[in-house]
Curated annotation (Swiss-Prot):
InterPro entries linked to this entry: AAA+_ATPase, ATP-dep_Clp_protease_ClpX, ATPase_AAA_core, Clp_ATPase_C, Clp_protease_ATP-bd_su_ClpX, ClpX_bact, P-loop_NTPase, Znf_CppX_C4
Keywords for this protein: ATP-binding, Chaperone, Metal-binding, Nucleotide-binding, Zinc
Organism: Mycobacterium ulcerans (strain Agy99)
Pfam name, any one: ClpB_D2-small
PROSITE patterns for the chain: CLPX_ZB
Keyword Metal-binding attached: yes
Subunit (UniProt): Component of the ClpX-ClpP complex. Forms a hexameric ring that, in the presence of ATP, binds to fourteen ClpP subunits assembled into a disk-like structure with a central cavity, resembling the structure of eukaryotic proteasomes.
Residues noted as binding ATP in the record, renumbered to the chain: P122, T123, G124, C125, G126, K127, T128, Y129
Similarity comment text for this entry: Belongs to the ClpX chaperone family.
Binding site for Zn(2+): C13, C16, C35, C38
Record HAMAP family: ClpX
Domain annotation ClpX-type ZB: ranges: 1-54
Protein name: ATP-dependent Clp protease ATP-binding subunit ClpX
Length: 426
């Protein structure tokens, strides 16, 4: 045991040798002592090693095929969007590695620029989930922002720098790590210019926000208020370089298909309209033929579109895809609710026609995959309320009638054990 002095009553740190009078705190272990200063030093070393381990390394970065296969385990359908995202993300992190490792003049002569991503598609088709799954696989900081809350600087609402604050918070305020993260900006179609022609009045939540986003999308040294909110001159700012931040912006872009139809020679309205059934319209990829001029006509400014060179479109989910979403992914809803019932000692079963009926309702409501959970909650609410208070239920079976006609799920009673039968007969 480490002691100082003739009396042997003055303890000292076993690592740095400082006495208990020279440090704030001395913690005892079996035969050893450690001071608060050595503990702080150990924490710093561990944090540095963890930060180094979390960095995305090129030799460890999954190839586009592997990225797509990983997405397949969580997201059903949207094959074109998966391929586009896989290639774009792989190239983005290759570009970061090339910037860090290029030292000879030949490599430095070629500067690889950033390719941000624009995702188009109806609500509930997996745009946000695709981006979240990507970030999970790559182990990089990931932040989601809502474009509808943003306004031009000086007006009521959020500044665009608050988006960067969310990314810094996701990286535990490690700015270096945040500078290689991913930011997903949703509802970007809601900041479209209110009219195709420039207006005399300021459009502070539309074109003004697009203008404010230009610099951070392209790459700039931004000053971010550490507590969020508006900037004021008496506060410290966090400096972050957005050059290597990958931006994925997404929106439903309702009405864009009519603009595309007009351009390619198909009339969307009137006597010359091409007549198609609703089923055909729902399963058609409206945005496969989108061009920059369509987005400009919709209300995005040319400078904004130019900073989003990669376009990935997602399609409406058909009935077959929704049924697969319910049961096949690793965290499918059926598996989630089955696990919830297992915790109460009850087995849960969905018939095939019940899953099809749930998919039909989601299509009818127009909510896509996002509406599946709401339907499941409605169907299972009565039994989820009663079952925890009962010990005579072995199994719950959800049928087509349960979904369509609000009939209670079939409850299979549990057979009493031998001891329970003996007690009952006694």
């Amino acid at each position: 045991m480490a002691r100082i002095g003739d009396g042997g009553d003055l303890l000292k740190c076993s690592f740095c040798g400082k006495s208990q009078k020279q440090v704030k705190k001395l913690i005892a272990g079996p035969g050893v002592y450690i001071c608060d200063e050595c503990i702080d030093l150990c924490n710093e070393i561990i944090e540095e090693e963890l930060a180094d381990a979390d960095d995305v390394k090129l030799d460890e970065l999954p190839k586009p095929v592997e990225i797509r296969e990983f997405l397949e385990g969580y997201v059903i359908g949207q094959d074109t969007a998966k391929r586009t995202l896989a290639v774009a993300v792989y190239n983005h992190y290759k570009r970061i590695q090339a910037g860090e490792k290029s030292h000879d003049s030949r490599c430095e002569a070629v500067e690889l620029t950033k390719s941000n991503i624009l995702m188009l598609g109806p609500t509930g088709c997996g745009k946000t989930y695709l981006a979240q799954t990507l970030a999970k696989m790559l182990n990089v900081p990931f932040a989601i922002a809502d474009a509808t809350a943003l306004t031009e600087a000086g007006y009521v609402g959020e500044d665009v720098e608050n988006i960067l604050l969310k990314l810094i918070q996701a990286a535990d305020y490690d700015v270096k790590r945040a500078e290689t993260g991913i930011i997903y900006i949703d509802e970007v179609d809601k900041i479209a210019r209110k009219s195709e022609n420039p207006s005399i009045t300021r459009d502070v939540s539309g074109e003004g926000v697009q203008q404010a986003l230009l610099k951070i999308l392209e790459g700039t040294q931004a000053s971010v208020p550490p507590q969020g909110g508006r900037k004021h001159p008496h506060q410290e700012f966090i400096q972050i370089d957005t050059t290597n931040v990958l931006f994925i912006v997404a929106g439903a872009f309702a009405g864009l298909e009519k603009i595309i139809y007009e351009r390619v020679g198909k009339r969307g309205l009137g006597f010359g309209a091409e007549v198609r059934s609703k089923a055909e319209i729902d399963t058609t990829d409206h945005f496969a033929e989108v061009m920059p001029e369509d987005l400009i006509k919709f209300g995005l400014i040319p400078e904004f579109i130019g900073r989003l060179p990669v376009v990935a479109s997602v399609t409406n989910l058909d009935k077959e895809s929704l049924v697969k979403i319910l049961s096949e992914p690793k965290n499918a809803l059926v598996k989630q609710y089955t696990r919830l019932f297992e915790m109460d000692g009850v087995e849960l079963e969905f018939t095939d026609d019940a899953l099809e009926a749930i998919a039909d309702q989601a299509i009818h409501r127009g909510t896509g995959a996002r509406g599946l959970r709401a339907i499941m909650e409605e169907v299972l609410l009565p039994v989820m309320y009663d079952i925890p208070s009962r010990d005579d239920v072995a199994k719950v079976v959800v049928t087509k009638e349960t979904v369509q006609d609000n009939v209670l799920p079939t409850i299979v009673p549990r057979k009493p054990s031998r001891s329970e039968r003996r007690d009952k007969s006694a």
